[in-house]
């Protein structure tokens, strides 16, 4: 944000905080280009760094100044004179530049809020693994959890409307609407993985989708505030108790349908926990399923009335944490009892007591992971390793580095797994697939290739963490062995690997 503060001060004084004129500034596209170059190595570099140049940017801005080029009929959309032969490149440049512009209000709001609250920036909280210590601390005390799939908006206009609260410039919203209408299919959000979240325009559409999700989450804050008001008010003032008990005799659906505005006042709000990543969220509670069904109804009703999305109640699954596991962020988590026996001595009598405590168990999803490996041709559907034929043309070191990198990323991400046996099986599949790929390249058998290369080839698949722990803590000690196999949460994981994301 600091890198273009100087540019913004000049534009603010001249344009009164309008964002629309920034689309004609060359430094906006330069910033978008630099951000593409500085992406994390874990992500694909999808920027236009090899095609972009200052001359192309100047040509694009000069064409945008000619407003008649923006007036394009629907019938003539295939022969767009504005983009010409550089249609894909120009549209990508505009989308990435516009993403930088729209991020400005959000960045300014974040900076001002941090300054007001004097909050110290903690980049560790950005790690995906920071959610699991929260699970370990809160979820063992809860009873029910709602597995919620946030519906996709059926129309791009909904995404544009969600920005109107933060972007006060109508011209920018009109430009975004025109850009989306002319160069993208309005119905592509129904199948987001195919077109709208294409890698070439991922930044802009992720920004729009995140603003849409923030709008969806606003109802949770509203319901929480409404329910908290009940704690400060006497129940006798709010309603008559006889009428209340009459209502709960009827089915939950009738109560909600007949008394929608007042339903919030009939139940005390218990300890609610909410977490979300991408389009999946979990709403956990300590109370009865009746309250969870109430929250379920409000979410579905909010989607239908505010976003005009016909959401089926089946997108929200209510499960009991002690009996069902939930899949979140690639881990299969469940709450299981941890029983410990305590011996108590009282004078001459001694007796044993069972102390039962709930504990979060995070497991490695072996079956979905084998399915992910089978899709990218590392093994078959049964988990039998096969050679990666598309990599056979690469050098030996390149092939080994690719397999080792995949194994290290999986070991790093699943370091918090309660049981590592399934993870070791996946690493075995990767090792044998690497050997088979090398043997295929050299037209040899696996046994012959291993004899020629030696066992040091497989040592490459040990991660740096495993090597350090094996040196510091020998496995002869049972205590250190349990520590070696314990769960470790890292604070540098900012994204999910494609193999981890099974959906």
Curated annotation (Swiss-Prot):
Compartments, as annotated in UniProt: Plastid, Chloroplast
SS bond list: none
InterPro entries: Domain_X, Maturase_MatK, Maturase_MatK_N
Any GO CC annotation of this UniProt entry: chloroplast
GO biological process entries: mRNA processing; RNA splicing; tRNA processing
GO molecular function terms attached to this record: RNA binding
Keyword field: Chloroplast, mRNA processing, Plastid, RNA-binding, tRNA processing
Function comment: Usually encoded in the trnK tRNA gene intron. Probably assists in splicing its own and other chloroplast group II introns.
Family recorded in the similarity comment: Belongs to the intron maturase 2 family. MatK subfamily.
HAMAP family xref list: MatK
Protein's name according to its UniProt entry: Maturase K
Origin species: Rosa foetida (Austrian briar)
């Amino acid at each position: 944000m600091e890198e273009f503060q100087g540019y913004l001060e000049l534009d603010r004084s001249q344009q009164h905080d309008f964002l629309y004129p920034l689309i004609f500034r060359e430094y906006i596209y330069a910033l978008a280009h630099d951000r593409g170059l500085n992406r994390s190595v874990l992500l694909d570099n999808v920027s236009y760094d090899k095609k972009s140049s200052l001359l192309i940017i100047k040509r694009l801005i000069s064409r945008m100044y000619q407003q008649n080029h923006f007036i394009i009929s629907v019938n003539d959309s295939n022969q767009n004179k504005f983009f010409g032969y550089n249609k894909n490149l120009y549209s990508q440049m505009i989308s990435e530049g516009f993403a930088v512009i729209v991020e400005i209000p959000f960045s300014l709001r974040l900076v001002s809020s941090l300054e007001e609250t004097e909050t110290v920036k903690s980049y560790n909280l950005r790690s995906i693994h920071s959610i699991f210590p929260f699970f370990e601390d809160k979820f063992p005390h809860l009873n029910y959890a709602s597995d919620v799939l946030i519906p996709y908006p059926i129309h791009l206009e909904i995404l544009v409307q969600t920005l109107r609260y933060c972007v006060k410039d109508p011209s920018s919203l009109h430009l975004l609407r025109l850009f989306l209408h002319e160069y993208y299919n309005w119905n592509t959000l129904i199948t987001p993985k195919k077109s709208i979240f294409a890698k070439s325009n991922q930044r802009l559409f992720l920004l729009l989708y995140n603003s849409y999700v923030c709008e969806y989450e606003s109802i949770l804050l509203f319901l929480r505030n409404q329910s908290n008001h009940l704690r400060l008010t006497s129940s006798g003032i709010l309603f008559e108790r006889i009428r209340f008990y009459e209502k709960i005799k009827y089915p939950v659906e009738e109560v909600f349908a007949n008394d929608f505005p007042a339903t919030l006042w009939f139940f005390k709000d218990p300890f609610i926990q909410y977490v979300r990543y991408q389009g999946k969220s979990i709403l956990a509670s300590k109370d009865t399923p009746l309250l969870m069904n109430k929250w379920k109804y409000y979410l579905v009703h909010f989607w239908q009335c505010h976003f005009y999305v016909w959401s089926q109640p089946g997108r929200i699954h209510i499960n009991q944490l002690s009996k069902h596991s939930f899949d979140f962020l690639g881990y299969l988590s469940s709450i299981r009892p941890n029983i410990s026996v305590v011996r108590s001595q009282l004078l001459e009598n001694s007796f044993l007591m069972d102390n039962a405590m709930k504990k979060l168990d995070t497991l490695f999803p072996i079956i979905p992971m084998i399915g992910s490996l089978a899709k990218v041709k590392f093994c078959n559907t049964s988990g039998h390793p096969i050679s990666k034929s598309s990599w056979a043309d690469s050098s030996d070191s390149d092939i080994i580095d690719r397999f080792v990198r995949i194994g290290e990323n999986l070991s790093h991400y699943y370091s918090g797994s309660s049981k590592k046996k399934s993870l070791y099986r996946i690493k075995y599949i990767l090792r044998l697939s690497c050997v088979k790929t090398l043997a295929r390249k050299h037209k040899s058998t696996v046994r012959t290739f291993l004899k020629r290369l030696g066992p040091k080839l497989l040592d490459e698949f040990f991660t740096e963490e495993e090597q350090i722990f094996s040196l510091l803590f020998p496995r002869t000690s049972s205590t250190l062995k349990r520590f070696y196999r314990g769960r470790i949460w890292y604070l540098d994981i900012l994204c999910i690997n494609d193999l981890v994301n099974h959906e």
